[in-house]
Amino acid sequence: MSIQSSEIIETIKMVADQNFDVRTITIGIDLHDCISADIDQLNQNIYQKITTIGKDLVETAKILSAKYGIPIVNQRISVTPIAQIAAATKADSYVSIAQTLDRAAKAIGVSFIGGFSALVQKGMSPSDEVLIRSIPEAMQTTDIVCSSINIGSTRAGINMDAVKLAGETIKRTADITPEGFGCAKIVVFCNAVEDNPFMAGAFHGSGEADAIINVGVSGPGVVKEALENSNATTLTEVAEVVKKTAFKITRVGELIGQEAAKMLNIPFGILDLSLAPTPAVGDSVARILEAMGLSVCGTHGTTAALALLNDAVKKGGMMASSSVGGLSGAFIPVSEDEGMIAAAESGILTLDKLEAMTAVCSVGLDMIAVPGKTPAHTISGIIADEAAIGMINSKTTAVRIIPVTGKDVGESVEFGGLLGYAPIMPVKEGSCEVFVNRGGRIPAPVQSMKN
């Protein structure tokens, strides 16, 4: 394949001026062969396997970054959901396992480790319940462990007992971690995917290989710049510009993933196409939507613009790689997107509008700060609403919500780094307590009649 000099310059500009980077190289590790009835032995086995397989990940990322001139921001590990791995111990707490994950991840130098997780879309085993009840203390006593709960799916419906427990767990975590920061490391899913490289929702699915490389790219700034420099007038032309730009972004991610797999001698799994923003100016999904013609993200037309963006990214990415997977779309994390932050502060981007946007984008209600006084049943109601969108539309949806103790609407909270900062957003005054407390399961939807 011949490469034009203009294409080389274009790639250099993507990195130098438009905040393009490979957001993460994530190694997924299967822990089934670590299982032991003795929790101390289990912890020892887990530590040994993670540090053995992941020991060269950080150094490999540095070598590839230097070789190709592409920043590789994070190196991460995802593991088999711990509720499955720890069941044989019959322990009443899995906090020590979270602490083992934390130690192992720090020993090899990665930025996060995911998989302190439970899959409870149809029901909770005793081990699932122990894990979920361990989450608050696990988040309090670890630094880089991430947790997730899958509470629903299109085939199983929504487990409302798990939704209720998830709301209580998030509320408890907010109460015992500074400014609710522990909640930034907890995601509640409907239709969770098994090969997600992004945190905080990554875990290594049971259908995966013993170890696998998954890569996530990030290029909102590149897409925005392409739109601003194009002659596109109609939305058809806008979609074409986004599609072609996504192709270029994806090719870089594919190259890095294949090279990393070769160097680490671990199979290449998937490339996640998701446009992942940061709080930096020029790296915002919201600003892409505004470049399409919206005065501010959150105004009328925002959901349509996001649908166009999400679909065009997928179409361009699928042409560039045969290994597309994960979540693959556009993320809309409020605290991690400079444009979303500004729109939320202006009052135009609301929780209701974000919920509508999640019906057409990559994941769901992400990194949203709410008043610390928000009751657990309200959090559960928000989770149930979001799960319903995912269940009915056969897509992944998720909630990462942070009740900030001691703060109310009009104030903001600073998380720092990639997590950014967020204005406290209002929640509805009415109560869903009776509804949430009913428990049971919302049945899976009929598939033949789609309206």
From Swiss-Prot:
InterPro entries named among the record's database cross-references: UPF0210
Disulfide bonds: none
Family per similarity comment: Belongs to the UPF0210 family.
Subunit structure: Homodimer.
Protein name: UPF0210 protein APP7_1551
Native source organism of the sequence: Actinobacillus pleuropneumoniae serotype 7 (strain AP76)
